[in-house]
């Protein structure tokens, strides 16, 4: 499985996307994808994930802009040297697309900043 990674201010985000045969419906133009996400804190202060934003661009020109908690309830705290892992999914109407985005995080001192999610492709039947 191919991984995509980016680091912002000592927070590394690694994404591993996969096409999901089930529940995809080729005739109904519904293509489902899952992605495992690892968020590693290599800094010296703990951070808490507050929000995520996904921008999903489909090959047919359609775009989804999703902002909110997603699968981040309760809001995970990641101590220095630790990694938080969770899964997300989406359904698109095209065979192909791309996803990019960011996480809003907060340090223990209250400082908030955005951590980039590496852009990654969605390719139907690419498994």
Task: Report the location of each language-model feature.
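Intrinsically disordered, low-complexity Pro/Gly/Ser/Thr-rich segments with frequent PxxP/GP/PP motifs
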Residues: 65-96
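Short beta-strand segments
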Residues: 11, 47, 64, 111-115
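Asparagine-centered strand-capping/turn motif at beta-strand->loop junctions
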Residues: 39-43
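Short glycine/serine/proline-enriched coil/turn segments at secondary-structure junctions
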Residues: 25, 46, 93-97
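Short acidic, flexible loop segments centered on an aromatic residue
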Residues: 45-64, 105
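Low-complexity, acidic Ser/Thr/Pro/Gly-rich terminal tails and inter-domain linkers that flank the onset
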Residues: 1-32
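Terminal connector regions
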Residues: 3, 91-127
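Short, solvent-exposed loop/turn segments enriched in Ser/Thr/Gly
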Residues: 30-36, 99-100
